[in-house]
Amino acid sequence: RCGLELGTQDVYVNVAGGASLSDPGADLGICLAVASSRLERPVSPGVAVCAEVGLGGELRPAGAFERRVREAHALGFPSMAGSAEDCSRAVEGGCLGFQTLCECIDGVLSPASHEGGRFP
Protein backbone atom coordinates (compact mmCIF):
# COMPACT_ATOMS: atom_id res chain seq x y z
CA ARG A 1 0.00 0.00 0.00
CA CYS A 2 0.95 3.63 -0.50
CA GLY A 3 3.79 2.80 -2.90
CA LEU A 4 6.26 1.79 -0.20
CA GLU A 5 7.38 -1.30 -2.16
CA LEU A 6 8.10 -3.47 0.85
CA GLY A 7 7.76 -6.79 -1.00
CA THR A 8 11.52 -7.23 -1.29
CA GLN A 9 12.26 -6.04 2.25
CA ASP A 10 12.58 -7.89 5.54
CA VAL A 11 10.67 -5.84 8.11
CA TYR A 12 11.19 -6.44 11.82
CA VAL A 13 9.22 -4.66 14.52
CA ASN A 14 10.61 -4.53 18.05
CA VAL A 15 8.44 -3.31 20.91
CA ALA A 16 10.25 -1.67 23.82
CA GLY A 17 10.71 -4.03 26.73
CA GLY A 18 9.49 -6.99 24.68
CA ALA A 19 5.86 -6.14 25.41
CA SER A 20 3.11 -7.78 23.40
CA LEU A 21 0.90 -5.51 21.31
CA SER A 22 -2.75 -6.45 21.46
CA ASP A 23 -4.21 -2.92 21.16
CA PRO A 24 -5.39 -2.25 17.58
CA GLY A 25 -4.81 1.46 18.28
CA ALA A 26 -1.08 0.75 17.93
CA ASP A 27 -1.48 -0.23 14.25
CA LEU A 28 -0.99 3.30 12.95
CA GLY A 29 2.17 3.86 14.98
CA ILE A 30 3.72 0.67 13.64
CA CYS A 31 2.75 1.48 10.05
CA LEU A 32 4.15 5.01 10.31
CA ALA A 33 7.40 3.70 11.83
CA VAL A 34 7.85 1.35 8.87
CA ALA A 35 6.95 4.08 6.35
CA SER A 36 9.25 6.56 8.09
CA SER A 37 12.16 4.15 7.86
CA ARG A 38 11.48 3.20 4.23
CA LEU A 39 10.99 6.79 3.05
CA GLU A 40 13.70 8.25 5.30
CA ARG A 41 11.22 10.86 6.57
CA PRO A 42 10.64 11.29 10.31
CA VAL A 43 7.26 11.75 11.93
CA SER A 44 6.66 15.47 12.42
CA PRO A 45 7.69 16.64 15.91
CA GLY A 46 4.93 16.84 18.48
CA VAL A 47 2.59 14.36 16.77
CA ALA A 48 1.28 11.26 18.55
CA VAL A 49 -0.73 8.70 16.57
CA CYS A 50 -3.52 6.25 17.34
CA ALA A 51 -5.77 4.28 14.98
CA GLU A 52 -6.50 0.79 13.78
CA VAL A 53 -5.41 0.18 10.18
CA GLY A 54 -7.58 -2.09 8.03
CA LEU A 55 -6.27 -4.45 5.36
CA GLY A 56 -7.33 -1.95 2.69
CA GLY A 57 -5.33 0.83 4.33
CA GLU A 58 -8.37 2.54 5.85
CA LEU A 59 -8.02 4.09 9.30
CA ARG A 60 -10.55 2.88 11.84
CA PRO A 61 -11.48 4.37 15.21
CA ALA A 62 -9.47 3.35 18.26
CA GLY A 63 -11.13 2.79 21.62
CA ALA A 64 -11.01 5.53 24.26
CA PHE A 65 -9.65 8.02 21.74
CA GLU A 66 -10.51 11.12 23.77
CA ARG A 67 -8.61 9.73 26.77
CA ARG A 68 -5.64 8.97 24.52
CA VAL A 69 -5.65 12.54 23.18
CA ARG A 70 -5.65 13.97 26.73
CA GLU A 71 -2.80 11.64 27.72
CA ALA A 72 -0.79 12.62 24.63
CA HIS A 73 -1.27 16.30 25.48
CA ALA A 74 -0.17 15.64 29.08
CA LEU A 75 2.99 13.98 27.72
CA GLY A 76 3.80 17.05 25.61
CA PHE A 77 2.35 16.07 22.23
CA PRO A 78 0.24 18.99 20.96
CA SER A 79 -1.23 16.96 18.07
CA MET A 80 -2.81 13.52 17.71
CA ALA A 81 -3.25 11.86 14.32
CA GLY A 82 -6.04 9.32 14.05
CA SER A 83 -9.04 8.24 12.04
CA ALA A 84 -11.25 10.96 10.61
CA GLU A 85 -14.16 9.44 12.53
CA ASP A 86 -12.39 9.69 15.89
CA CYS A 87 -11.20 13.23 15.19
CA SER A 88 -14.67 14.38 14.15
CA ARG A 89 -15.90 13.44 17.65
CA ALA A 90 -12.88 14.67 19.61
CA VAL A 91 -13.47 17.52 22.04
CA GLU A 92 -9.77 18.17 22.63
CA GLY A 93 -7.94 20.31 20.07
CA GLY A 94 -4.99 19.37 17.92
CA CYS A 95 -6.58 16.33 16.28
CA LEU A 96 -5.45 15.44 12.75
CA GLY A 97 -8.03 13.15 11.12
CA PHE A 98 -7.29 10.96 8.09
CA GLN A 99 -9.35 8.45 6.09
CA THR A 100 -6.44 6.28 4.92
CA LEU A 101 -2.91 5.31 5.84
CA CYS A 102 -1.63 6.93 2.63
CA GLU A 103 -3.22 10.27 3.60
CA CYS A 104 -1.73 10.00 7.07
CA ILE A 105 1.76 9.27 5.71
CA ASP A 106 1.53 12.38 3.52
CA GLY A 107 0.16 14.49 6.37
CA VAL A 108 2.28 13.32 9.31
CA LEU A 109 5.73 12.47 7.95
CA SER A 110 8.08 15.44 7.59
CA PRO A 111 9.32 16.27 4.10
CA ALA A 112 12.53 14.53 3.00
CA SER A 113 15.47 16.15 4.76
CA HIS A 114 17.93 15.78 1.90
CA GLU A 115 18.07 15.94 -1.89
CA GLY A 116 18.40 12.81 -3.97
CA GLY A 117 17.37 10.29 -1.32
CA ARG A 118 17.43 6.59 -2.08
CA PHE A 119 13.69 6.39 -2.60
CA PRO A 120 11.44 8.57 -4.75
Provide a role label for each language-model segment.
Residues 1-120:
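Peripheral, non-AAA+ core regions of ATP-driven protein-machinery
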